[in-house]
Each structure stands twice: as C-alpha cells, then as structure tokens.
Amino acid sequence: MSFITAFGDRVFVASGDLIRTFRIGDDEGMTPLISWSELNPERIQKPSFEAEKDLKAVDKRVILCLAHSNMIAAHGRRLVAVGTNEKQIHVFEYFIDNNYKIVKAEHIVTSVVPKAPTAIVFDREDAYVVVGDRSGDVHRFSVLNGSAIEMAGAISMILDVAFSPDGKRLLMADRDEKVRAMRYPSTYVIDAYCLGHTEYVKTLAIQDNDTVWSSGGDKNLHMWSITNCSKPRRTIDLSEWDAPVRKISINVAHKKIAVLFEKKDKMIVVDLETDPAATQSVTILNESECLDVTSTGHYFIVLGRSTITVINLLTMLQATFPIDDELNAVLSATKDAVDNLFKNVTHNNQLEYEKRKAEKFEQIEQKRRRLNNQEPSTS
C-alpha cells in the first residue's frame, strides 16, 4: 500500500516499509524520515488485548495507513503516525531548523492494535491517534504512553476515519455503505448515520464543522450535514468514469475536490462553487495509475506508481517531483491490503454472513452497555 499526506509545504510519502519526505519547491530532494532500526524498545508497548498477547510476526513490514499531526496549538508537535501489518501503530516526532529543514526525527511510541489497522487520524489536540481496523473497531492511542481505549465498533471493516475541524465529531466510513458521525471523545453518542451509498464508502473529505463529503464503490460523491444525515445535501454522479472512487481530497481554500479512481492514470477536479458541479479531468503525466492524493496550500499532490505530481491550483500546471530508485521499486510493486472491497454475499454464504453480522451486533451492544456504565472521558 502507498500513501501521501502533507503539512504546510512538507510532504510525506509511505510505501512498503519506506517513509520519505520532501518540501515543495526545495531542490534538495527526498529524504528518509526514519530508520526502523532506530525504534526504541522501551517505547514499544505490550499488547493489552486478551486475544492478541503476542506481536504479529511478518516477513516484511508494510505500512497500511499514514497521518500527520494538526499542530493547532503554538507549542504543537510535528508528529507522523503509521499503522503496519504487524498490528502496530508507530508515532514519530521530527524537528526542523530555521530553514525548515528536518534536523532530527525520533521514535516516540509504538502501540499494538487487536486487528490490522486500515485508517488513522490525529485528534484535534494531537494527544491521541484514532485508528480504525479490519474488524470494524476504532481505538484511540495516547501519543505519550501508547495506552489504548476502545472508542466505537461497526459491523464491517472501517475504511476511513476523520475529524471535524473543531474536533468535536469523529466520522467513520465502512464497508457496509455507511458514514457515522459521533461525538468525541464521548463516541457512545452517535449524532447521525449518513445512509445513501449503495456500496462501500472508501474515503471522506471534511469541508467544515457540519459538512463532509464521501465516496467509494457506487461512484457517487455525496455531501452530508454532519449533524443531520437524513439524506445527502448534494450528490455528484461520477459513473461516467466507469471505476470505483479510490480517494477524495478537499482543498477548502480553493473550494475544489480531487477525485482519484481505481486503476486510472487520471483524476478529476470538482469545482464546489458551481451548481451543477463543474468537473475537470486531469491526466497525470508519465503515470500509469494514481494511488493517493492530498491537498495543501495551493496544491493537490498526487502519488502514482512511478511519480509524485504537484498540481498548482492557480494554474493547473503539473510539476513532477523526482523519487529515488528504492521508492520507485516499491511503488511499482505496491498492492492494496484488500483487493476487492465489494461484498460477495451469495445464496450459499448468506446464512454464514447473517450469523457473523448478528454476532458482531451483539459484541457492539455489549461494548456500548459497558461504555454507558463508565464515566465519559474528557481528555
């Protein structure tokens, strides 16, 4: 799997077990963020889950999700978090000099998740990373000591997690066509279910405290009110592109959304200020397949199998950032953790599917009853 994210003019790329970083407009090129050999064993937390007392042994570490801290506070820390196929969450801190160059990066903490992580995000204060996993559960982990708290559960795999800008709502997208909006940190209070998709919801983009966009397998781009998800406030039909949506990313300042599709070498840019929405197709130069996209400043940045492309939203001109041979080899061979997110419920396995669903419902109800008997945390 391969991911890209950005904070200011600094961009981070994760693919395989590599984490690279560069600055837009910097001639010094791409550099590794960390070396895995530098993990501090004393900062690797022991599993606290009954079903997972041993760390998962893997032939090769693979990064499954990537996030950067928000740095809302003046004293905010520059943190990068990744989840791996070892069922671990690693948090790193990096430090910059007066020229904004990274002078040091260090391992802060490693936590253990019960199932393979699928999505990760920092909460608004950067005190916790919130992680969704393949079993449908969501946990949060302290960046100070790695301690874990279970926050929520769903029937099916969590595919994306995101926060409203004020940090008061946690949103989850899952394989069962739902977007869920919950209060944070009191996630046992569910404000709304956004029900309108007919296939899995792969990706979320937050516009403001009451607006979220979602898309995925049904090729629709829906806009929802976070506090009232009774029906989409706006829907943009993307079926003409004949592919499921892989990723959306919003540039709030320019009021545009970038949309990537599965197995395509192009993206579209949706202008949110027009109604009906105007879309512009952008073919990524010298690229065979787009893997991820992020937004920062005046740019969309697209990660492909062989390129990193910076698109200037003022001019729509493309600039390709050079990548090293090692990263290029990993990107060219990268594979998704789950090949097919479409559900395959046939007559022969319907009863088994319903049984698993009922068992999951019961687990969620038990967890909810347990949470209701606890005092809600305000930290």
Swiss-Prot record:
One Pfam family named in its UniProt record: WD40
Annotated localization: Nucleus
PROSITE patterns listed in its UniProt record: WD_REPEATS_REGION (PS50294)
Coiled coil (residue ranges): none
WD repeat placement: 58-102, 112-151, 153-194, 196-234
Biological process according to GO: tRNA (guanine-N7)-methylation; tRNA modification
SUPFAM superfamilies: Tricorn protease domain 2
Signal peptide limits: none
Any one GO CC term of the record: cytosol
Top-level lineage group: Eukaryota
Gene3D superfamilies: YVTN repeat-like/Quinoprotein amine dehydrogenase
Pathways involved: tRNA modification; N(7)-methylguanine-tRNA biosynthesis
Alphabetical keyword list: Nucleus, Repeat, tRNA processing, WD repeat
InterPro entries: Trm82, WD40/YVTN_repeat-like_dom_sf, WD40_rpt
Major localization class: nucleus
HAMAP family in alphabetical order: TRM82
Purpose of the protein: Required for the formation of N(7)-methylguanine at position 46 (m7G46) in tRNA. In the complex, it is required to stabilize and induce conformational changes of the catalytic subunit.
Subunit structure: Forms a heterodimer with the catalytic subunit.
Family: Belongs to the WD repeat TRM82 family.
Protein name in UniProt: tRNA (guanine-N(7)-)-methyltransferase non-catalytic subunit
Organism annotation: Caenorhabditis briggsae
